Amino acid sequence: MSLNALDCARLTGQTPYTVEVFRPIRNIFNRVREYTRASTTSVGLAWMSKYIYQYHRLMLMNLSPREPATEGWPLFLYPPPHLLVGYQYLVRTCNDYVFDTRSYSRLKYTEIHLPLQQKLNWTVMANCSYTINTGAYHRFIDFENFEETLAQVQQAVLAERVVADLALIRPMRGYGTTNMAGDRQVPVEGLLQDHYKNLSQCQNHAWGLADRMRIQNAGNKDIVILTTIRKLKTAFFNFLVSPRNPHTILSLPCDCLWLDAFMQKFTDPSLSQFQTIQSLPSQSVTKSIISALSLPGPAPCTPLSGGAFELRPRENGRAVTEEMRRRRGEMIERFIDRLPMRRRRRRAPPPPPMSEELSEPEVEAFPPASPPRRSFEEEVRDTIVEAIRLLQEELTVSARNEQFFNFAINFYEVIQRLEMLGNINELTIRRWVMYFFVAEHVATTLNYLHHNLRLYPPCSRWVDLELAQVVMRARDHEGQVVYSRVWNEMGENAFSQLMARVSGDLAATVERAGLGELEEEEMEQFMADIAYHENSGDVSEILRQVAINDTEVDSMELSFRFKVTGPVVFSQNRQIQSINRRVVALASQLRMQHRPLPAQHEQVQLPP
């Protein structure tokens, strides 16, 4: 398959005009003589890349003819003799995310010799990391400094896939530092061409890393849906933790669109009315968190009671909760129809509930058993569940992609088992909350990398993912490593396979909270539960993680390492080939004389 000019431009960050001048060719079989020897071998290209052209930086610049980057040594107003297809796109992908640090190994080159084929590939290992402040979660559970962290924690819980310490006002693009091939603090943002849209436009529509990443490629309809889902979850959580006020009696007409009023009431940006959450038991608050996070799934905990008002039990002689249940479908359909979007398919309106004014049915000898009485809180949750489910059906396929976010199932199953065993205590709750949000970050980041490196068609066609690794380092308040974990996977599906392993591993560890060190007979079963793989870290580190008191963990450093390989293309432009031949000749001459090479952009006289 030949590399087309459009894919080349997209993956190198160059303009179509530059690619047209460059005239790329992938396979140089039977054309090797047109190029200098150093340009066609892996050893020669590695020498040129490091000492003459500095490809690790040059490939990030605008290489159009007569641009500032091409002035003087070694380009002399023309593009370089090679383009590393996908390298600039890789750096741009890493740069556009909230990593604190990004490091890239030295570029390596390999030769491919097959019948009628002679090619070169480039390979680089990227290591991107950032630190999350898990101490904020402990303070939340302990209710220390609550007034300072309430807004952040509430966003972290309800934004879905985000933590409080990564504020959205912080720009993602270019944040942190970048090191390349021994060069420190490389100003990547200044080198990269800004081809992509400004992601800050999404910040008024959704919280959180995952929401922002999903909206990155979403249309207006998906933005409306994702924002509405977030508001419904926010409203439900605020409803659960609101203080019950016996002086406020809610009169709820059975034919009103109560879901609109409910969402508006409990998504008030002012959190002052919810400050009394501090007086609630920590387990009650955490159960409310879990119930909101699990939407639209079933509630993993025992039924919860909400506050804010007392519900008038009957309206005009009718049971309000029962009437809400009967009119639920109609009310949800009308709620979704009122959103500013066009629905995927019009649904037939549900039949109206039967009027009680009809003639009374004949009395049966054995009347059917009445359904179990439902609480108002259960009906509210079931209504929100159904509304979110229908909204998710309206999402486009790309926005609905959840393969990296089904990790929550593992955590909900754990909390259900703990609930049945009566083992929900401070230690298990603390570890569940901390690992859930760590898994949120891992899922969000791996999904972002998978979307950009595997699902983006030009990249998936030409750039191969060889291996991926996630490293998790827990540190105490002094910055010392408490324990570290490593997960490795190989191949094209490494990102999704990593997520499955990390989520199952962390969820299984929750059940061991507070139980101390593993006994000899328990160790084998635990290793089977987490599906331990060889070359996935020291077993002693896993045992240390299981037995640790989680209050010692103040921060968690997450490192994402991945090795990618892409094609090297050669220029067919005779002028570029001639300049390269003369540059290599001068560089070889200076090297033999043990003299330094000219500085970048220096004006020198090339040999004929």
UniProtKB/Swiss-Prot annotation:
InterPro entries: Adeno_preterminal (IPR003391). GO terms for biological process: DNA replication; viral DNA strand displacement replication. The record marks S536 as: Priming of strand displacement replication by covalently linking the first nucleotide of the new DNA chain. It holds the Pfam family Adeno_terminal. The record marks Y175, G176, G307, A308 as: Cleavage. It is found in: Host nucleus matrix. This is Preterminal protein. It comes from Canine adenovirus serotype 1 (strain CLL) (CAdV-1). The gene is PTP.
